């Protein structure tokens, strides 16, 4: 309702809608909310997870820093208000094809591996989200292994 009022007032004053505004039906908002959920399921978001979230959203969705922060803010609110994951996964299913959904699962694994470990809550979340997105167990596990391998390689390169 608040969005409708803002849009109405904007139209009356001749103002333009901000091009990076994220509506409730924007799959990027749904994807970001899932990433936020993944990063906070183990208690809180670490600094490395926050940096990874910003980098993932900025690069995958080709956003500038301000739009990325706006997406994080809007998605955090949406995730805090959500009672389940279906709100986000159903939007992603309606919007993205299989390669797009696989990309979301890959982003979530990257988010989960940002702190260097995967706990049982994160693993269960990935199983549930992948299932809701229609991603097979085989693909989910293959993406996990690929991201884990890339994470290990980048950690080894940084230590050298």
Question: Where is each model-derived feature located?
Answer:
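Small-residue-enriched hydrophobic alpha-helices in membranes
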Residues: 1-37, 41, 46-160
């Amino acid at each position: 309702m608040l969005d409708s009022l803002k849009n109405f007032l904007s139209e009356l004053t001749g103002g333009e809608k901000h091009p990076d505004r994220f509506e409730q039906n924007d799959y990027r908002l749904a994807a970001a909310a899932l990433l936020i959920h993944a990063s906070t399921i183990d208690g809180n978001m670490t600094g490395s997870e926050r940096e990874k979230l910003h980098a993932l959203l900025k690069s995958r969705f080709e956003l500038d820093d301000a739009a990325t922060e706006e997406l994080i803010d809007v998605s955090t609110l949406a995730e805090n208000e959500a009672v389940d994951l279906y709100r986000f996964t159903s939007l992603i299913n309606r919007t993205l094809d299989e390669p797009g959904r696989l990309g979301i699962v890959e982003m979530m694994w990257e988010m989960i591996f940002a702190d260097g470990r995967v706990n049982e809550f994160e693993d269960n979340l990935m199983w549930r989200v992948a299932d809701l997105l229609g991603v097979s167990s085989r693909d989910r596990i293959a993406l996990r292994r690929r991201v884990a391998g890339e994470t290990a390689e980048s950690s080894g390169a940084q230590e050298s």
